[in-house]
Amino acid sequence: MNRSTLLLLLPVLTGLISCDGSDSTVSQDGEATPLILASQRGDLKTLAALLGQGSPPDVRDSCDWTPLMKAALNGHGAAVDQLLAAGATVDAEDKGGYTALMLAASNNHARVVERLLTAGAMADHQEGTQGWTALIWAAKQGHRQTLETLIRHRADPTLKDFSGRTAADWARETGHSGLVSLLEAANSGSSETNR
């Protein structure tokens, strides 16, 4: 892995390792969170049992991650569906402002991205550390299918991150030239819609 790729992944990797040095499967009050573990693993049987026993679907770990975020990050679509049906907050944010949609997009889980958008996730939410959106994540990582899904759901290609770069700028900078034309076409389409 080269240095620029590592720098791109650093915010997510830091969150995955742990945001404060503690076990991220432990809730803020120190209690074990089996629902988060089941969601992370995509263990549908355990997930159904825990939700059926009244486990709150938006329990948080020490990094403010929810079960929905863990399921989305790992591409567990059926777990995402179960959590949403149980009332999980689709746009819950972690300590950095990341949402389940961003985490799914960063790992190219296009079907999970589709599910979250259909459930009402905000396509253009910007996280608080770099100002990245799900579309910027998909463009930076070269995730064509996820990028196309986001564009279909009208994600705004003109949004800029805190450094002033758009998704097309990131695609170009990270060597994903095939995505630049898609983003530019979406950009011209959104410009015409806004007239």
Feature locations, PLM:
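Conserved ankyrin/ankyrin-like repeat signature
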Residues: 46, 78-79, 111-112, 145-146, ...
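Ankyrin-repeat boundary/linker signal
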Residues: 27, 60, 93, 126-128, ...
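Ankyrin-repeat-protein effector appendages
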Residues: 2, 11, 19-34, 119, ...
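Start-of-repeat signature of ankyrin repeats
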Residues: 31, 64, 97, 130-131, ...
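Ankyrin-repeat inter-repeat connecting loop/turn
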Residues: 57, 90, 123-124, 157
